[in-house]
Amino acid sequence: RRQRQMCIRDRYGFMICFFIGFAVKLPVFPLHGWLPDAHAQAPTAGSVDLAGILIKTAAYGLLRFVIPFFPTASAQFADIAIIFGLIGIFYGAWCAYQQTDMKRLLAYTSISHMGFILLAIYAGNILTFQGLMIMMLAHGLSSAALFIMSGQIYERLHTRDLRLMGGLRGQLQYLPFFLMFFVAALVGVPGLGNFIGEFLILMGSFNKYPVFTILASISLVFAGLYGLILIHRALFGEPNPEQKQHYTSPLKDLSAREVGILMICAIGLVWLGIYPQTFLDVSHSSMQWLVNSYVPVQEVVETVQQTATQLEHVEIQ
């Protein structure tokens, strides 16, 4: 019995080590501190790579290694992981609401959205896993496009400070439209890919974690707030007098190459939002394998815990 307990503890410890490694990369609160600074200092291409691809590898690592290698320990750890994810959702949204640097704002939105990813992984059913896949694709497109646009704005205004922006809607033709479109996608407007991913995750999580799911749904209000702040400060109002001296008027609008890059991301988001079944069919077999290896273990763990409690009472008597 003692050897069995040590084996269980060892597996749990190994699982925690794997989890911490991937949690830093995802990132999960409170291991997130590197991401806003990394985005703020990185060039546009680096931010696009980081937001669009690299942080998604952590979610892949959790799915590919942590859940299959340590299903029992993962099932025991699920509630704690979801609490960390929920804290990250609110913390990221609240910090994004307070930012004045455009890239730091977008970095905190990624922290908030990765909380949904953690909720999806540890809720552990086919709906959340499929929603996770759609959300990673959609977030990769929308966040990458917004980091591209932050670079485009910086080339024209020589600043990322939202307090020094304003009035772009009246000076440019294409940039305001794309900025509003991708912000709408990021906050989960229906008809675009992010909405499908969030909807599937929340629907799949509700049966087992109704309270956590309701709280995660409330956080979407903060997403709308930071999205509106970004759009209002950048596009509306009057141009900041302090900033006018740093660029020549009129501003140069997006080139055909820049529009083409953004159109690719926009088409992908619309496709994900209108016809996600294309991607769901491809991922279904892999996600079902994960469900089969994880969900039964959750049920076994609950049964074993109940049996152990009953045996303890019998021994005491």
Where are these regions (language model features)?
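Hydrophobic transmembrane alpha-helices and their helix-loop junctions in integral membrane proteins
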Residues: 1-5, 9-233
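Cytoplasmic/organellar membrane-interface segments at the starts of transmembrane helices
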Residues: 172-175, 228-317
